[in-house]
Amino acid sequence: MLLDMDLGVLLPSLQSVYVLVFYFVYLAVAGEILPGKVIRGVLLSDGSQLRYRCNGLLALILLVAILGICAKLGIVSPLVVADRGLELLSATFIFCVLVTLALYVTGRSSSNKGSSLKPHVSGNLVHDWWFGIQLNPQFMSIDLKFFFVRAGMMGWLLINLSILAKSVQDGSLSQSMILYQIFCALYILDYFVHEEYMTSTWDIIAERLGFMLVFGDLLWIPFTFSIQGWWLLHNKVELTVPAIVVNCLVFLIGYMVFRGANKQKHIFKKNPKTPIWGKPPVVVGGKLLVSGYWGIARHCNYLGDLMLALSFSLPCGISSPVPYFYPIYLLILLIWRERRDEVRCAEKYKEIWAEYLRLVPWRILPYVY
């Protein structure tokens, strides 16, 4: 009986499918009709530029308001995600597999020569399915890469809110849960306030859309980044005042470094002459920024991201390694990504890169790494 029950919750129910369909339809419609700043993407190799409507913040606020009203009227339960988390996870996984298979088939048959849709086929089915064939595939004029990352970030907040509602109903709401919820909500809201910065990230401008990105956006971000909330739902942790203060400082410093570094990079790409910290930017070879945070470490934004990830886990205390899965995973991922980027940059910039390394010797954490 127990085995049957455990296997049952791993299978997608009709209700979980309905939730997923409603969610995607809402995001598609809201993304098209809600007002928002239209941003030009980076210049692609064929000279084209994609346009992105950055209305994610408005779409998120409206969605939370709609769900709140529906919960108040008894139309939908705020616990639907918390109670059916595994069912939603399995439904999302199946969707990821199906949509990436469709992307593989349509990508292989594409004859488009533009940078966004030109197929890149290696001949290895698994490789092409995993890494993708096209850079910016679309469905009914919707840029799927931008759409999926938006869905993942919003999904993370919705899962957290359902966990919060569950803890209130169970009477298990704690300082730790409140702290975790506040930090994550601020991080996610800030992401959508600065959604246009996403258009200049490596994932958007260089990575093709395959299972790796789709799975990462739709399943990995919302379901694994919320592990701390799930853990706190079943484990009560009482923090001391000094622990709360330290946790807040880690979050604030991490946010300052993360947002500041990404903002400087984004602005530099848009206008290389914009002053940084009140001074003209220092640039190596006319391409590599060595001012501001980017003169402290070559990937200072990674340091901020790691501090933020740590701040999400610190409310859980140190009694278990489980809540620290996210910062540990992120540390491994960012070191791997940083190493990969260094190789690419060395090949691309050659002598300029050697001079850049001399001026900015530290990779992520100054005087340590």
Swiss-Prot record:
GO cellular component: membrane
Primary location group: membrane
Residues binding NADP(+), per UniProt: K265, K269, L289, W294, N301, Y302, D341, C345, A346, E347, K348, Y349, Y356
GO function terms (MF aspect): Delta14-sterol reductase activity; NADP binding
Reactions performed catalytically: 4,4-dimethyl-5alpha-cholesta-8,24-dien-3beta-ol + NADP(+) = 4,4-dimethyl-5alpha-cholesta-8,14,24-trien-3beta-ol + NADPH + H(+)
Protein family: Belongs to the ERG4/ERG24 family.
PANTHER family with a match to the protein in the record: DELTA(14)-STEROL REDUCTASE (PTHR21257), DELTA(14)-STEROL REDUCTASE TM7SF2 (PTHR21257:SF52)
Name the record gives this protein: Delta(14)-sterol reductase
Phylogenetic placement of the source organism: Eukaryota, Viridiplantae, Streptophyta, Embryophyta, Tracheophyta
Encoding gene (name): FK
